[in-house]
Design a protein with these regions (language model features):
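Solvent-exposed coil/turn segments that connect beta secondary-structure elements
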Residues: 75-77, 83-84, 209, 268-269
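C-terminal cap/substrate-recognition subdomain and adjoining C-terminal extension
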Residues: 38-49, 53-55, 59-69, 141-179, ...
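Short, solvent-exposed loop/turn and secondary-structure capping segments
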Residues: 81-84, 90-91, 191-192, 258
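Bacterial N-terminal signal peptides
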Residues: 19-31
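Sec/Tat signal peptide C-region and signal peptidase I cleavage site
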Residues: 33-37
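A metal-dependent, Asp-based hydrolase signature
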Residues: 83-158, 162, 166
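N-terminal secretory signal peptides that target proteins for export/translocation
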Residues: 1-15
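Asp-based phosphoryl-transfer active-site loop
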Residues: 68-82, 256
Length: 300
């Protein structure tokens, strides 16, 4: 038997080098294709100027290796809330069905909370926001999710802004983590927002409270995502500074200022002059305030 030579011939070496060279070329040419395959889809209803600016910004993020985060307010930013906030509508509906005709201590306590909220009237104030959670205390997370989902199906389906859904789809195409940050109870909003926007429910953040023995308690977990608390939620729970932040109201101002890239102001109010309690927005409407900030934001 002829002894096999374990040493490659010159021809074998040449073939091996060619194959190796081809492999390197294929690797080098296929890599950019995977990195730069994102395609921006124009958002109908927004101007060419706005679309071009968003696309240009997204293209600057293509080579980023760190987390790309976008944060949006919920009520009034991604979904319309007229004439009432879904968070309030859901509570009133539930009380009408389950507590109205009862005289036991639990029912009286829940109705008293709603009466206090009506008397307060400031549905973006922290006390009002906390009272929503107090109303839900004692229920299971699943019951609260279903309450919000049923109210959405009955009264708010079709009120998502299509432009915002298109924007979020573009962001996902470019590899962004999209988070929704709302001052409404977290469990109440998670199910329908996650389903409509195609996001994990863990990326829907709202007012949190401790769950003990499978039921919501009155113990609220700080920070409350309203006003300055919204800005504090970002480093506390998201743990990354966002490249894009979008909101629509005074309560979103602090959160918007956390963006290190685009600030998107959706349907800003141009009627109510803000007071001293609104800090730097004092003397301006929401639209006027962001207008004077110059090109650091984009109004939709």
């Amino acid at each position: 038997m002829k002894e096999l030579n374990s040493t490659p011939s010159k021809r074998d070496k040449k073939t091996f080098l060619i194959h190796q060279f081809l492999f390197v070329i294929l690797l080098a040419t296929s890599y950019p294709t995977s990195v730069f395959s994102q395609t921006y889809r124009k958002i109908a209803g927004w101007s060419d100027e706005v679309n071009n600016r968003i696309e240009s910004f997204l293209n600057t993020t293509l080579t980023m290796n760190n987390r790309k985060v976008a944060v949006f307010d919920g009520d009034g930013t991604v979904i319309g809330q007229v004439p009432y906030y879904l968070a309030d509508e859901a509570l009133y509906r539930y009380a009408d069905k389950n507590y109205k005709d009862r005289n036991d201590p639990q029912a009286k306590s829940k109705i008293a909370i709603l009466n206090r909220m009506v008397k307060d009237g400031n549905n973006v104030g922290k006390v009002y926001v906390e009272d929503r959670v107090h109303f839900l205390a004692g229920m299971t997370p699943a019951e609260i999710m279903d309450m919000g989902y049923e109210c959405y199906l009955d009264s708010y389906q079709g009120k998502f802004y299509p432009e915002m859904k298109q924007l979020i789809a573009n962001l996902k195409e470019y590899g962004f983590e999209v988070w929704i940050l709302t001052a409404s109870p977290e469990f109440l909003y998670q199910k329908f927002l996650a389903e409509e926007l195609g996001l994990p429910d863990t990326q829907i953040l709202g007012v949190k409270s401790v769950v003990a023995n499978g039921r919501l308690t009155d113990e609220i977990i700080m920070p409350i995502p309203q006003d300055d608390g919204k800005a504090n939620v970002i480093p506390t729970f998201i743990k990354a500074r966002p490249l894009i932040v979008g909101g629509n109201s005074r309560g979103d101002m602090d959160m918007l200022n956390q963006s290190c890239g685009l600030k998107i102001v959706v349907n800003p109010d141009d009627t109510t002059i803000r007071g001293k309690e609104d800090g730097p927005m004092n003397g301006y409407t929401v639209k006027q305030y962001w207008g004077k900030r110059g090109s650091g934001h984009r109004e939709m």
